[in-house]
Amino acid sequence: MVLDYHNIKTARWRMITHRNMNHLDKQYEEIAEELRFPLFVKPVNCGSSIGINKANDFEELDDAVKTAFSHDNKVIIEEFIKGRELEVAVAGYDSPYASYVGEIKACNDFYDYDAKYVLGDSELCIPADIDDEKMKEIRETAIKAYKVLGCKGLSRVDFFMTENGDVYLNEINTLPGFTP
């Protein structure tokens, strides 16, 4: 909501908590109708893609939500953004600096825990193969989001870029792993 207010695009999402677990089937129907499959299911407070799953149907959605709830009592369900995975390191306090944009070429369907730490076949290309104008836009958006959310020190800002060049902020990691 804060990022939307500042014209920073993000995937559409819904959050569910342990409190509203009694009516999951109804929520699943509403969420699938609004966001459409495939969906990404994430525990709110985990890192390294732990507990994140892609759901292509209701059965996978239920399994993914149960997995996410095993890690946290709040779960985010996001629409799938088909595009390239990009990342930017942002460092500083009052006048933060953004690094070059890097691109993650995941060896799996998405950059999950296995793609980061187990399989070792994912690639990180720095700088990403994007034009200078898009590089500037992404770096400026990363700094803007960093400031808007009150980040300090060091963060990694993750993005998706669609085939037509639309950029969506995926998340800000305030304890980034900077995995290769």
Where are these regions (language model features)?
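Active-site nucleotide/adenylate-binding loops and adjacent lid/helix of ATP-dependent enzymes
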Residues: 1-78, 82-83
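A short coil-to-beta-strand element that immediately follows conserved catalytic motifs
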Residues: 10, 98, 154-155
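Active-site-proximal flexible loops/turns
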Residues: 19, 49, 86, 165, ...
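Glycine-rich phosphate/pyrophosphate-binding beta-alpha loops
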Residues: 49, 104-107, 173-180
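Phosphate-binding site of ATP-dependent enzymes
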Residues: 56-137, 161-168
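Conserved metal-phosphate-binding beta-hairpin within the catalytic cores
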Residues: 79, 89-90, 146-178
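Internal helical hairpin/lid segments
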Residues: 123-124, 134-155
